[in-house]
Curated annotation (Swiss-Prot):
The active site is at residues 343, 347. Plays an essential role in viral DNA replication. Binds the origin of replication and cleaves the dsDNA replicative form I (RFI) and becomes covalently bound to it via phosphotyrosine bond, generating the dsDNA replicative form II (RFII). In turn, viral DNA replication initiates in the presence of host Rep and DNA polymerase III at the 3'-OH of the cleavage site. After one round of rolling circle synthesis, protein A is linked to the newly synthesized ssDNA and joins the ends of the displaced strand to generate a circular single-stranded molecule ready to be packed into a virion. GO terms for molecular function: ATP binding; DNA binding; DNA ligase (ATP) activity; endonuclease activity; zinc ion binding. It comes from Enterobacteria phage phiX174. Belongs to the microviridae Rep protein family. It holds the Pfam family Phage_GPA. This is Replication-associated protein A. The keyword Ligase applies. One of its GO terms (biological process) is DNA replication. A zinc finger (unnamed) spans 246-268.
Length: 513
């Protein structure tokens, strides 16, 4: 009906099959979701999904509905005039939305490259005050598919909860947690290499500030933005400058195991310490202080405890800060600079916290004196927060072959503890290289996708529940160092991210949190 603008069997003569076959490995490794970040392909996918949903809703609404001489009949029964009028009004609006999407299609030339930003022809500009690119972006932002479902009362069907869905959900959550931890550990590694200051902080919520915190949906964003501006000020830069190059953060929510009290663990990475940051042990006979006074009063919703992360040859030591001692006056035990990363990572992996987070506030577990107040507050799910592109920095891949990039998307954890970061960076590099491929070629070369949940449910009948997890794992075998090319091995060695290399580095660097 409207899918004719996509390649199909009737277009087969227009495609160079050798070229399409050559593209398939890179497109499969990169993935359509990554490639859809390119403007032209992204807009095609956006419009396709929007049209499919609107057509589906229209078809659903018209089931059993007939019109005769201005009267409406539903399953043979005549509808009241007010019901008919409302139905017609809503249906007309639905069809207007469809027509709007149909008007965009002629502006999306599938023979153009996927990185092209469509502007529109003369007719488009006569009818619209913005380019096709601006129109599509505004439509996606102001009219998401969820809003369409809500307005037309067409919710998504709830999935069946069974052993397969639970296994898949657990596997997805495990992968997400693993990716977050990899980004944290890579950021620690990079901060050490670049000589940045690392500060660990715990943010609590005071009883009298709970309501203010929950009333402000941007409380955490504003806090980290303020810290970023403090770093900018210390570098003599404007407050409205981007602080991405001088400040980053990683924040994990935790619900206390005793009574479910919400607090946050944050790691700040700063190229320059905020103005007024001085060694808390300067002039003291017992050097047992670790907190940064310059950051102590920046959290407006409770108590914070910003502590300098110390290790041999850290940025604090190079700035002349004294090495702190413990309560007994003994120098702090030296451990790897990665220790703080592992310390924060345990909160990412803490399953009891994930269970409480799924309930929202964990209000029932919070102490009894606050139960009434909490019942008046909106339920809210707090997730791990981090700076944009946090921990994603890797050695450039611009000179690597496509074959090498494909291998980097398939590496296992045994080859490098940063395999998921490598995968995303390799996919991004491939997306840039595929930018000059046409939309038609990408759509023709895209692999046939398998519904993993349906496949698992079909497989369970043959292999049984007990063997399902290992069977699924065997389907996604990862490459080891012995499986990859010399080019890929050389890249890992040069980047210093092989498991062996990272073990050596952890021995080189002493320190403690």
């Amino acid at each position: 009906m409207v899918r004719s603008y996509y390649p199909s069997e009737c277009h087969a003569d227009y495609f160079d099959f050798e070229r399409i076959e050559a593209l398939k490995p890179a497109i499969e490794a990169c993935g359509i979701s990554t490639l859809s970040q390119s403007p032209m392909l992204g807009f095609h996918k956006q419009m396709d999904n929007r049209i499919k949903l609107l057509e589906e809703i229209l078809s659903f609404r018209m089931q059993g509905v007939e019109f005769d001489n201005g009267d409406m009949y539903v399953d043979g029964h005549k509808a009241a005039s007010d019901v008919r009028d409302e139905f017609v009004s809503v249906t007309e609006k639905l069809m207007d939305e469809l027509a709007q999407c149909y008007n965009v299609l002629p502006q999306l030339d599938i023979n153009n490259t996927i990185d092209h930003r469509p502007e529109g022809d003369e007719k488009w500009f006569l009818e619209n005050e913005k380019t096709v690119t601006q129109f599509c972006r505004k439509l996606a932002a102001e009219r998401p598919l969820k809003d369409i479902r809500d307005e037309y009362n067409y919710p998504k069907k709830k999935g069946i909860k069974d052993e397969c869905s639970r296994l898949l959900e657990a596997s997805t959550m495990k992968s997400r947690r693993g990716f977050a931890i990899q980004r944290l550990m890579n950021a620690m590694r990079q901060a050490h290499a670049d000589g940045w200051f690392i500060v660990f902080d715990t943010l609590t919520l005071a009883d009298d500030r709970l309501e203010a915190f929950y009333d402000n949906p941007n409380a955490l964003r504003d806090y980290f933005r303020d810290i970023g501006r403090m770093v900018l000020a210390a570098e003599g830069r404007k407050a409205n400058d981007s602080h991405a190059d001088c400040y980053q953060y990683f924040c994990v929510p935790e619900y206390g195991t005793a009574n479910g009290r919400l607090h946050f663990h944050a790691v700040h990475f700063m190229r320059t310490l905020p103005t007024g940051s001085v060694d808390p042990n300067f002039g003291r006979r017992v050097r047992n202080r670790r907190q940064l006074n310059s950051l102590q009063n920046t959290w407006p919703y409770g108590y914070s405890m910003p502590i300098a992360v110390r290790y041999t040859q850290d940025a604090f030591s190079r700035s002349g800060w004294l090495w702190p001692v413990d309560a007994k006056g003994e120098p702090l035990k030296a451990t790897s600079y990665m220790a703080v990363g592992f310390y924060v990572a345990k909160y990412v992996n803490k399953k009891s916290d994930m269970d409480l987070a799924a309930k929202g506030l964990g209000a029932k577990e919070w102490n009894n004196s606050l139960k009434t107040k909490l019942s008046l507050l909106p339920k809210k799910l707090f997730r791990i927060r981090m700076s944009r592109n946090f921990g994603m920095k890797m050695l450039t891949m611009t000179n690597l072959s496509t074959e090498c990039l494909i291998q980097l998307t398939k590496l296992g954890y045994d080859a490098t503890p940063f395999n998921q970061i490598l995968k995303q960076n390799a996919k991004r590099e491939m997306r840039l290289r595929l930018g000059k491929v046409t939309v038609a070629d990408v759509l023709a070369a895209q692999p046939v996708t398998t519904n993993l949940l349906k496949f698992m449910r079909a497989s369970i009948k043959m292999i049984g529940v007990s063997n399902l997890q290992s069977f699924i794992a065997s389907m996604t075998q990862k490459l080891t160092l012995s499986d990859i090319s010399d080019e890929s091995k050389n890249y890992l060695d040069k980047a210093g991210i092989t498991t062996a290399c990272l073990r050596i580095k952890s021995k080189w660097t002493a320190g403690g949190k």
